[in-house]
Structures are given as C-alpha cells and as structure tokens.
Amino acid sequence: MKFFLDTANIEEIKEAYSLGVISGVTTNPSLVAKEGRDFKEVIREIAEIVDGPISAEVISDDHEGMVKEARELAKIHKNIVIKIPMTAEGLKAVNILSKEGIKTNVTLIFSANQALLAARAGATYVSPFVGRLDDINTDGMQIIEDIVTIFTNYDIQAEIITASVRHPIHVLEAAKLGAHIATVPYKVLMQMIKHPLTDIGIERFKEDWKKAGLKI
C-alpha cells in the first residue's frame, strides 16, 4: 500500500515527506481554504516538495467548466492529478480529460457502482470515503472490499485511494483488503508511528545503557 498525505499545509507536507513514506498528496477546496492562501500558489509549492501525484480539485459543476479548470491546473506541474466529483457531469469531464492524457481522481465516491462507473470513464484513481460512510452508521470498509473485488474481477487499472480516513484502523483494514493507497491526515500518520510499548522500550534501553555507563 502507498500513502498519500491529505492536507494542504506546507509544514505538515515537509515533515511527513521527510519520513520517506509519503508517495503523494491529496487536497480539496476545504483544505486549501483553511490555509488562507492562493490555490495555485499552494499547489505549486506542494509540487516543489513532493515528487509524486498531487490531487487538486475543480470547482465547477458543469463538465465544460471542469475541463477548463482541469487544463489550467494540469499546466502547473506534470504531477498534478485533477480531482473530479462523482456526478454525471464529472464523468463527462473524466472521459474528455483521460483522452487528453490528463490524470484524474474521482472523489466523493460512496458506492462500488460509482467507483466502477468512474473507472470505466477513464479515471486514474477512485476515492471512496470510508469515514463519512461510518458517520451514517454504514460499514465504510465494505465499500473498499466491494471495489477491490470488482476491480480484480475485471482487471480494472484505476487505483483505489481510501479516503476520509479518521484513524489508523481505517488504514490497517484498507491495507488488508487490498486498497492501493490510503490518503491520511497528518494527525493519523503521526498516530500510526506511535505505540506506547515502543516508548516504554526506548526508555528502558536508555536506563540500562546509562546504568552500565556505556558510550558509542
């Protein structure tokens, strides 16, 4: 499984990327708005830090507007992936963009049917939102299992990005089910690193080393 970072915060991206585990970044209008900066400027700066796919989302509702915005965003850097909402207009945009060689990430997917349609339209990535499904008392991981099964059955090449990740268990379950990617908030990535027994072990080693009076 690959890890993307789900943020538009430059400092978080720099810190996470330095760990050597991040393969890409996903953003959305809400994340960019939180930074209070120019959209294209933020995306451009991310592209200077991360050597991998960077998802930037369109705002228009109609496919003509989506395609126009996508073409502009794609000019920023070769690694830009265009996030397109899962709507009929979105599918039209994906169909056009895929024929132009522009990579797309279809977002706000809440069913396996939606993922299948997005992939058939030419999406490079599909992003099912597991956390938001959990929020409405639905098993969010079931959609990952369903999409993995369908894509495997028909040798569909679109990659599955597990999105709306709320905690490390979401990542673990998605990895066990075979999702290609998990896009995680910075907070969740930090939670994945930590374990109380690791901290206890480190302190015990330090104490034993100090008692023995050893040096490197």
Swiss-Prot record:
EC class name: transferase
Positions of the catalytic residues: 83
Pathway, per record: Carbohydrate degradation; pentose phosphate pathway; D-glyceraldehyde 3-phosphate and beta-D-fructose 6-phosphate from D-ribose 5-phosphate and D-xylulose 5-phosphate (non-oxidative stage): step 2/3
Gene3D superfamilies in UniProt: Aldolase class I
GO terms for biological process, alphabetical: carbohydrate metabolic process; pentose-phosphate shunt
Identification of the protein by name: Probable transaldolase
Classification via Pfam families: TAL_FSA
Main location: cytoplasm
GO MF terms, alphabetically ordered: aldehyde-lyase activity; transaldolase activity
Gene Ontology cellular-component annotations: cytoplasm
CDD domains listed in its UniProt record: Transaldolase_FSA
Catalytic reaction(s) noted: D-sedoheptulose 7-phosphate + D-glyceraldehyde 3-phosphate = D-erythrose 4-phosphate + beta-D-fructose 6-phosphate
Subcellular location field: Cytoplasm
Species classification: Bacteria, Bacillati, Bacillota, Clostridia, Thermoanaerobacterales
Record-linked NCBIfam families: fsa_talC_mipB
Family: Belongs to the transaldolase family. Type 3B subfamily.
HAMAP family noted in UniProt: Transaldolase_3b
Keywords assigned by UniProt, alphabetized: Cytoplasm, Pentose shunt, Schiff base, Transferase
InterPro entries xref list: Aldolase_TIM, TAL/FSA, Transaldolase_3B, Transaldolase_3B/F6P_aldolase, Transaldolase_AS, TSA/FSA_arc/bac
The keyword Iron is assigned to this record: no
